[in-house]
Regions:
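Acidic, low-complexity central loop/insert segments
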Residues: 1-30
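Structural motif
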Residues: 61-62
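The conserved catalytic core of RNA pseudouridine synthases
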Residues: 1-5, 37-55
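A short, charged helix-loop
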Residues: 31-36
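Glycine-rich, small/acidic residue-mixed loop/short-helix segments
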Residues: 13, 23, 43, 48-51, ...
């Protein structure tokens, strides 16, 4: 994501799909059709160098540019790792803070690690 390198093929080894997905989760990388109608900033596409602010026109450019220049992003995906390594949170589980305020929800989960879409402003208060 975001870079290209050339390596000799003998340094690579095949890994399972589970290992690949865990790598993505730990690094906050999302994928899938469910992202098609979402704001790229919410899914860290800007942090993964998936948005160019110097190239031509694209659908939603005004919204993306405005969000970038104002620095206002209300929600973002964050990776999480549960302390209890034997537990798991189901997708769409609502996450609440200690005050009971809703912070966001789980969007992907694999064992004790997962991704949550959190209300950035509530989460950082």
């Amino acid at each position: 994501v975001g870079c290209r390198e050339t390596f000799s093929k003998d340094i690579f080894h095949e890994v399972s799909l589970e290992v690949y997905h865990r790598f993505q989760i730990i690094n906050g990388i999302t994928e899938g059709q469910q992202l098609a109608d979402k704001i790229p900033f919410q899914y860290n596409i800007d942090l993964l160098k998936g948005i160019s602010f110097t190239k031509g026109c694209y659908l939603g450019q005004e919204l993306i540019s405005r969000s970038y220049h104002t620095g206002i992003v209300r929600k973002r995906v964050f990776p999480f790792n549960l302390e209890d390594q034997d537990s798991m949170l189901a997708v769409d589980t609502i996450l609440k803070g200690s005050s009971g305020k809703i912070l966001g929800k789980v969007i992907h989960s694999q064992g004790p690690v997962g991704l949550a879409l959190l209300d950035y402003l509530t989460f950082t208060d």
